[in-house]
Regions:
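Histone-fold recognition with a strong bias for associated Lys/Arg-rich disordered tails
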Residues: 1-155
Length: 155
């Protein structure tokens, strides 16, 4: 898996996604939980989403509408990624490599989510009627300008 390439900020996204999965008792970490993880990490991807009108409450409400609550209790140490989430993380690494980065930050993850048109996260973002192209442009501009600072966060 690509976790060794995650910056501290990307690790926060994953931890927060796991907490959201536990909140919904889904028993897995899906792209919808990753989206919530990005919204709970205090970085640039978070700010772009919030400025676009995507909030934790809106996303949680849509997850509840689409998937409801499950009945699976998973301990904090277990990380059960569904296949689509694994693919998003692999795609995040590919995005990072496109920019000659040897690390993954939340912005790479968000770009991968925005390209996965069959994911629940993409469906949620689309249903919130935001400017997907504008979000992508903001993220790409940020990545191009901030690669050195994020590389220092790699642990």
């Amino acid at each position: 898996m690509v976790f060794g390439k995650f910056t501290e900020r990307a690790q926060i996204v994953l931890v927060e996604a796991q907490k959201e999965s536990q909140y919904f008792k889904h028993g897995y970490i899906g792209t919808e939980h990753i989206l919530l993880g990005i919204l709970k990490e205090c970085g640039f991807a978070n700010r772009v989403l919030y400025i676009s009108g995507i909030t934790v409450d809106k996303v949680r409400n849509l997850i509840e509408d689409y998937l409801g609550f499950g009945d699976v209790d998973v301990s904090i140490g277990e990380m059960l990624l569904n296949p689509r989430t694994k693919r998003v993380f692999d795609d995040s690494l590919a995005k990072a490599m496109m920019y000659n980065h040897n690390y993954i930050n939340p912005e790479h993850i968000l770009l991968a989510l925005l390209d996965d048109v069959e994911s629940i996260a993409y469906t949620i973002i689309s249903n919130l009627k935001v400017d997907l192209k504008g979000i992508k442009t903001e993220i790409i501009n940020y990545i191009n300008k901030n690669d050195i600072n994020d590389a220092k966060q790699l642990e």
